[in-house]
């Protein structure tokens, strides 16, 4: 009998500080002990599924009630939900493409840092030592507000018990995608320049009509940063894609190969309704945004294990902070003329 078959599963395994359920299982039943065995490609959680004969996908996929055929196996169901939600988060791969750093913390309060390089006047530079400018790194005064993103179940166990696990997993995966898009909206809102950041906005030469020259102005405005991501709402993205320069063969090949829209400048196009019409947010993804996350995907495991699904919730706690303001610029090509004027 393999050691994984003797582990006593308890719901308290979900409440270990700073560790997920699978991490706790791995400490009890390390995967490295299974090298050279038929289970070497399974992690500790997957070995528990195998132990109880629970098949979560493919031919012969089990139904939800299989998890609840024994008290120990019921403990595995919250992790099943969590993994499906994580797949949905990963399927929406936009956040990683606009985030420079993803920081994990244990608490709910986080204070960011900022840096400023001292300026110099070339005419007053004297000896060689004065060529080295100081960089002042300070802690910001205000805390980053982390927000909880989640969903509350309204379905009962009886409504789900005879449903195939692969179908139920798709439902939770879609929940994960929804949460990811909500996070994307707040990330973009964080990136948008505030009212005091007037130097972050570049007005187009011909208001109301987007030209390729305007995109070049945005590219130049971001220097010395690189505009590798452009964010706009759906109508504005249509304007960008309508430019003759967007008929570039390389851009077309990139879209067919990856599913990602890119400009001839090499910048990825991201659609977000948080950006006003006829405005384009250009960022350098390597310097613009920090994502702060407290813990992982949280499932109300005690309620799920007790089959009280209609009262259970899933959530994750995340916040965003702009790192370098200079790595974010806005192109505005909105017409200022008034109707009838």
Which residues does each predicted region cover?
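Intrinsically disordered, low-complexity terminal tails
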Residues: 1-73, 337-341
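Sequence/fold signature of self-assembling virion shell proteins
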Residues: 2, 246-341
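Assembly/oligomerization interface modules of large self-assembling protein complexes
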Residues: 63-149
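Short helix/loop capping segments that flank catalytic or ligand/cofactor-binding pockets
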Residues: 121-123, 163-164, 239-241, 322
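Glycine-rich, charged/polar anion/phosphate-binding loops
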Residues: 139, 214-218, 296-299
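Alpha-helical scaffold segments that mediate packing/assembly in large oligomeric complexes
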Residues: 149-222, 333-341
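Helix N-cap / beta->alpha transition motif
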Residues: 156, 232-236, 284, 323-324
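Extended, solvent-exposed, turn-rich assembly/linker loops in the middle of proteins
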Residues: 193-261
């Amino acid at each position: 009998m393999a050691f994984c078959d003797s582990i006593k599963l308890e719901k308290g395994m979900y409440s270990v500080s700073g560790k997920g359920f699978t991490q706790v299982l791995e400490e009890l039943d390390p995967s490295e002990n299974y090298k050279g065995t038929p289970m070497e490609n399974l992690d500790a959680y997957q070995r528990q599924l195998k132990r109880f004969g629970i098949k979560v996908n493919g031919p012969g996929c089990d139904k939800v009630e299989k998890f609840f055929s024994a008290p120990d196996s019921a403990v595995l169901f919250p992790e099943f939900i969590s993994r499906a939600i994580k797949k949905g988060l990963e399927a929406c791969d936009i956040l990683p493409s606009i985030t420079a750093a993803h920081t994990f913390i244990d608490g709910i309060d986080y204070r960011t840092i900022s840096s400023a390089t001292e300026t110099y006047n070339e005419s007053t530079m004297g000896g060689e030592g004065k060529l080295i400018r100081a960089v002042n790194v300070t802690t910001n005064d205000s805390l980053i507000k982390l927000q909880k993103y989640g969903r509350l179940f309204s379905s009962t166990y009886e409504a789900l018990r005879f449903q195939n696990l692969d179908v139920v997993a798709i439902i939770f995966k879609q929940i994960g995608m929804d949460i990811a898009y909500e996070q994307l909206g707040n990330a973009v809102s964080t990136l948008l320049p505030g009212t005091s950041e007037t130097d972050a906005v570049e007005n187009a030469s011909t208001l109301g009509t987007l030209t390729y020259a305007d995109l070049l102005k945005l590219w130049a405005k971001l220097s010395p940063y690189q505009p590798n991501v452009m964010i706009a709402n759906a109508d504005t993205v249509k304007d960008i894609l309508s430019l003759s320069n967007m008929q570039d063969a390389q851009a077309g090949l990139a879209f067919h190969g990856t599913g990602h829209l890119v400009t001839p400048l090499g910048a990825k196009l991201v659609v977000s309704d948080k950006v006003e019409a006829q405005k384009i947010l250009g960022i350098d993804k390597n310097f613009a945004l920090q994502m702060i996350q407290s813990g992982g995907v949280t499932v109300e495991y005690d309620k799920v294990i007790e089959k009280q699904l209609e009262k259970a919730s899933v959530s994750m706690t995340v916040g965003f902070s702009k790192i370098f303001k200079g790595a974010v610029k806005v192109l505005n090509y909105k017409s200022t003329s008034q109707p009838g004027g």
